[in-house]
Design a protein with these regions (language model features):
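Conserved glycine-rich cofactor-binding loop
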Residues: 14-15
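Rossmann-fold cofactor-recognition segment
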Residues: 45-58
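A hydrophobic alpha-helix adjacent to the NAD(P)-binding/active-site core of NAD(P)-dependent oxidoreductases
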Residues: 50, 95-96
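Conserved mid-core segment of classical short-chain dehydrogenase/reductases
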Residues: 79-94, 135-138
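Active-site helix of classical SDR
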Residues: 96, 107, 142
């Protein structure tokens, strides 16, 4: 899907990757960018409309829906990462509330508009979706669950004409990764890679050097092969033996 002349909604849009995604959508000719945020928005482009949107707040989600007449692309970018050691269930729940359930609630709320436009859902996931980072296990758990949700949505929404893209994002130089001494890309580079993948129709998008090290193993591996076979059941009603070797 080309971004030019499209209406794009981005959650978590006031800083980091979200802010960069807003700018990149504008650079690619988006007709309108809806910037979902809990804080102030610095972008003054007339094509940008700020939406007060905490993805854990049902009333804010509904108010946002009421303000949007049409939508082509939903980018579920809002997320949190809290240091934990699996001893604090509250920390794990906070990750799930934002990174998993918030994503699902926003998707459900805007799905009628996306179905009408035959649009796209872009879920910002993480390399920790496939390989946990033990320093932030709650984050890794939530992102792994969000990957599974993305795969399920992809199969279930195909018949409605809605494409679902999962972004396997590596480390980006933002507030979220400030305490980690690891290679990072700029938010702008990540945003460009994400939109490249969307415009090229990639189901799973690997937008940075770290995530691209996983490409061959992921796309040619048994996990992706199994996903395709399961999707065949949903799309075609095919009867397959799941015990059969891949």
């Amino acid at each position: 899907m080309q971004i030019a002349e499209k209406t794009v909604l981005i959650t978590g849009a006031n800083r980091g990757v979200g802010e960069a995604l807003v700018k990149e959508a504008l650079n690619r000719g988006a007709k309108r960018v809806l910037a979902g945020t809990r804080g102030a928005l610095s972008n003054t482009d007339p094509r940008v409309t700020a939406l007060t949107l905490d993805v854990t707040n049902a009333s804010q989600i509904q108010r946002a829906v009421d303000q949007v007449a049409d939508l082509d692309v939903l980018i579920n970018n809002a997320g949190i990462a809290i240091h934990d050691d699996l001893t604090d269930l509250h920390a794990i729940q906070k990750h799930l509330d934002v990174n998993l359930l918030g994503l699902l609630k926003v998707t459900q709320a805007f799905l009628p508009l996306l179905t009408r436009s035959k649009g796209a859902i872009v879920n910002i996931l993480s390399v920790t979706s496939v390989a946990p980072f033990p320093v932030i296990p709650g984050y890794s758990i939530s992102k792994a669950a969000a990957l599974s949700l993305t795969q399920s949505l992809r199969a279930l929404l195909t018949r409605q004409g809605v494409s679902v893209h999962g972004v396997i994002l590596g480390s980006v130089d933002t507030d979220m990764t400030r305490g980690f001494d690891i290679p990072k890309v700029s938010p702008e580079s990540a945003a460009a890679g994400i939109f490249d993948g969307v415009e090229e129709g990639e189901e799973d998008i690997f937008p940075d050097p770290t995530s691209r090290t996983l490409v061959d193993g992921w796309r040619g591996g048994v996990t992706k092969a199994f996903e395709r076979r399961i999707n065949a059941v949903v799309l075609e009603g095919a009867q397959i033996d799941l015990r059969e070797r891949l």
